[in-house]
């Protein structure tokens, strides 16, 4: 989680935060390298968020190769757990290389909640999504945080999610300070949905094969969203 420290230090008291989202880079190593090159050409980027599925089969070699490619980024990056990342011993490897599957950090005045939503891979035997983690985040908001962005691999109502508690999940997300929007991957598509008809948009990022990433800017005027092809 050294990258989280880098993000928090570099964005401390910044009034405008700009970040990119990539997802589902499994198998597509050349395209992932091209994504890194495209992102490195920007001079307006604070960090990169990878919403999971770095591996296809949960193999250590896959994670290491993805880590090595992503380490070529000029800016810090963080990675979420995808459903494919859970296969075989993938969860253990993910934790060793990238850290815990539920985590949060602050960039400027924005709290980023990064959540494991791959309930199917855990046979519904674990707290996925971890509502207690979300509640604790809501109860202990760091000083200076004014708004929130939530990231996950699988979006609500996908086959991966525990959809019995979808409304409950959204309720606690909305308890966070001024929830702006959510980002996710998994479906290998670009889409924008308002799953709960509550004004909160969910932005889906496509896979590396489709050679695009999402770019967000957050400031006092709200936020902007862009799909960038490379």
Residue map of PLM features:
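Aromatic-lined substrate-binding rim segments of carbohydrate-active enzymes
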Residues: 61-78, 138-144
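His/acidic metal-ligating clusters that form di-metal
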Residues: 40-47, 122-199, 224
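N-terminal active-site segment of His-dependent metallophosphoesterases
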Residues: 1-65
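Active-site glycine-centered loops adjacent to acidic/histidine catalytic or metal-binding residues
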Residues: 24, 52-53, 82-83, 153, ...
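Metal-dependent catalytic neighborhoods of phosphoester/phosphodiester hydrolases
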Residues: 32-37, 52-71, 86-99, 160-165, ...
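Active-site-proximal beta-strand elements of phosphoester/diester hydrolases
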Residues: 16-26, 109-119, 149-153, 201-207, ...
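Binuclear metal-dependent phosphoesterase catalytic core
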Residues: 1, 6, 22, 105, ...
